[in-house]
UniProtKB/Swiss-Prot annotation:
It comes from Pan troglodytes (Chimpanzee). Residues 334-345 have a biased composition (Low complexity). It is a multi-pass membrane protein. It is found in: Cell membrane; Postsynaptic cell membrane; Basolateral cell membrane; Endoplasmic reticulum membrane. Belongs to the G-protein coupled receptor 1 family. Muscarinic acetylcholine receptor subfamily. CHRM3 sub-subfamily. GO terms for molecular function: acetylcholine binding; G protein-coupled acetylcholine receptor activity. Homodimer; the dimers can form tetramers. Interacts with NALCN. Interacts with TMEM147. This is Muscarinic acetylcholine receptor M3. GO terms for cellular component: basolateral plasma membrane; dendrite; endoplasmic reticulum membrane; plasma membrane; postsynaptic membrane; synapse. Keywords: Cell membrane, Disulfide bond, Endoplasmic reticulum, G-protein coupled receptor, Glycoprotein, Membrane, Phosphoprotein, Postsynaptic cell membrane, Receptor, Synapse, Transducer, Transmembrane, Transmembrane helix. Glycans are attached at residues 6, 15, 41, 48.
């Protein structure tokens, strides 16, 4: 005579439904077992009774009180940190406009998935571990599994989207960034969630209806179609190993591209310093004259430097020898020198900008110098090579074209009666804007045709050169800022990817081992591995804070409740500025 408990026992005091059994074998007990009620060591506090299906109704699942306290405390802290951290991410995105970038939209989606895991998955799985059985019924079990797997797979899909976004942003900055809008980011995020839902939710919720029966035993909770190790192995390959492989390859490409751009920027800065030194006009003695030989030597130096860098430079050389009446006119030679340098500087800036946009075409820069007597337009336009220069023969008076195909000679009269033979090397400059010379000369015969530029004075050419160097420095600064942003984004991606691999790998390794040896891994290891996957949701907000200063300062502001103080300080500052303005207004009126 023995006793077995009803399956619907209370958690603390079970409702005992006694039945008398005439033999020990009827109860599944070994022979010789005393089948007297008093022979059982019944603990009313623990309620250790076995149901016919073999499940245990012990609310502590065979754990001691201290074990339960430790498990509940540790998992509770992790769940709380996960919830708070991801709520901080969502609220920070809401309150700080600086965080509303396309890249952070993906992080926002990832934070939503992590928040679901922290609120639902962690707590239910902890209850399952402590009680050592599922006590909430089949429907709650299937809903929990569906939410858990959809949110976890959405995290993986979001990481994939972030990796591809970073990769295309760095490798295709011109074409991809034009299409990289918040609307497109929302579409990508929506697709990640829809794909995750379609892959897991219907199969988990309705598989028992597809096959006609439910094979999950009472008191247990797992996905029915994953009961076969081979199916579990296949899902592990598709849900973890393939995404991790793709993300690792993409991150490696991102790292190599970032390193290459860093070297290019260093070379650009070095060439910029060298060009600035070479382009500086050094007066020699009492004259600033410069012969065509010196200009050709300078061009050869620049062409040699061109071979060692990725930035391609095209230079123009204009020189002339002053006539006997103009030997004392010091500014003529300096005009030639500075005109050469100004055009060269413009080409430098155009070439560096070409590297910035990552295009094979030449960026267009036009610098218009409106001078008292004339205006000069220097254009750097799209030309695939420097051999396509076409200059009208009527304007430049082409001489000896067959023998010297790389030089064009022309003569142009100016109002003081002097003439300047000009020699032009092959240029990537298409002279298409007529020079306005109405105030200065009688060269009206060139109306409607392209013409060569007039020589600039020393002061004017210096201004043009300074402007070109400033443009170059601005381009370099923009490239540096863009590179810094890309590095920060790559650091955030690397931290998230590393955390994902560390936390998800142990469980998926056990899945592979279980395919060949289903009894080699203890249940405790399974629980730890599964919980470690949840910890990834705890670590992600920490990665954002460590790698992004804006996130870090916003987190601090929210945790210290400084939002209202910041608004008040801003309002007080605006009020002070308004008072100062009103005080100064009467004084200025006087």
């Amino acid at each position: 005579m023995t006793l077995h408990s009803n399956s619907t026992t209370s958690s603390l005091f079970p409702n005992i439904s006694s039945s008398w059994i005439h033999s020990p074998s009827d109860a599944g007990l070994p022979p010789g077992t005393v089948t007297h009620f008093g022979s059982y060591n019944v603990s009313r506090a623990a309620g250790n009774f076995s149901s016919p299906d073999g499940t245990t109704d012990d609310p502590l699942g065979g754990h001691t009180v201290w074990q339960v306290v430790f498990i509940a405390f540790l998992t509770g802290i992790l769940a709380l940190v996960t919830i708070i951290g991801n709520i901080l991410v969502i609220v920070s995105f809401k309150v700080n406009k600086q965080l509303k970038t396309v890249n952070n939209y993906f992080l926002l989606s990832l934070a939503c998935a992590d928040l679901i895991i922290g609120v639902i998955s962690m707590n239910l799985f902890t209850t399952y571990i402590i009680m050592n059985r599922w006590a909430l019924g089949n429907l709650a079990c299937d809903l929990w599994l569906a939410i858990d797997y959809v949110a976890s797979n959405a995290s993986v899909m979001n990481l994939l989207v972030i990796s591809f976004d970073r990769y295309f942003s760095i490798t295709r900055p011109l074409t991809y960034r034009a299409k990289r809008t918040t609307k497109r980011a929302g579409v990508m995020i929506g697709l990640a969630w829809v794909i995750s839902f379609v892959l897991w939710a219907p199969a988990i919720l309705f598989w028992q209806y597809f096959v006609g029966k439910r094979t999950v035993p009472p008191g247990e909770c797992f996905i029915q179609f994953l009961s076969e190790p081979t199916i579990t192995f296949g899902t592990a390959i598709a849900a973890f190993y393939m995404p991790v492989t793709i993300m690792t390859i993409l991150y490696w490409r991102i790292y190599k591209e970032t390193e290459k751009r860093t070297k290019e920027l260093a070379g650009l800065q070095a060439s910029g310093t060298e060009a600035e030194t070479e382009n500086f006009v050094h007066p020699t003695g009492s004259s600033r004259s410069c012969s065509s030989y010196e200009l050709q030597q300078q061009s050869m130096k620049r062409s040699n430097r061109r071979k060692y860098g990725r930035c391609h430079f095209w230079f123009t050389t204009k020189s002339w020898k002053p006539s006997s009446e103009q030997m004392d006119q010091d500014h003529s030679s300096s005009d030639s020198w500075n005109n050469n340098d100004a055009a060269a500087s413009l080409e430098n800036s155009a070439s560096s900008d070409e590297e910035d946009i990552g295009s094979e075409t030449r960026a267009i820069y036009s610098i218009v110098l409106k001078l008292p007597g004339h205006s000069t337009i220097l254009n750097s336009t799209k030309l695939p090579s420097s051999d396509n220069l076409q200059v009208p023969e009527e304007e430049l008076g082409m001489v000896d074209l067959e023998r010297k195909a790389d030089k064009l000679q022309a003569q142009k009269s100016v109002d003081d009666g002097g003439s300047f033979p000009k020699s032009f090397s092959k240029l990537p400059i298409q002279l298409e804007s007529a020079v306005d010379t109405a105030k200065t000369s009688d060269v009206n015969s060139s109306v409607g045709k392209s013409t060569a530029t007039l020589p600039l004075s020393f002061k004017e050419a210096t201004l043009a050169k300074r402007f070109a160097l400033k443009t170059r420095s601005q381009i370099t600064k923009r490239k540096r800022m863009s590179l810094v942003k890309e590095k920060k984004a790559a650091q955030t991606l690397s931290a998230i990817l590393l955390a994902f691999i560390i936390t998800w790998t142990p469980y998926n390794i056990m899945v592979l081992v279980n395919t060949f040896c289903d009894s080699c891994i203890p249940k405790t290891f399974w629980n730890l591995g599964y919980w470690l996957c949840y910890i990834n949701s705890t670590v992600n907000p920490v990665c954002y804070a460590l790698c992004n200063k804006t996130f870090r300062t916003t987190f601090k502001m929210l945790l210290l409740c400084q939002c209202d103080k910041k608004k008040r300080r801003k309002q007080q500052y605006q009020z002070r500025q308004s008072v100062i303005f009103h005080k100064r207004a009467p004084e200025q009126a006087l």
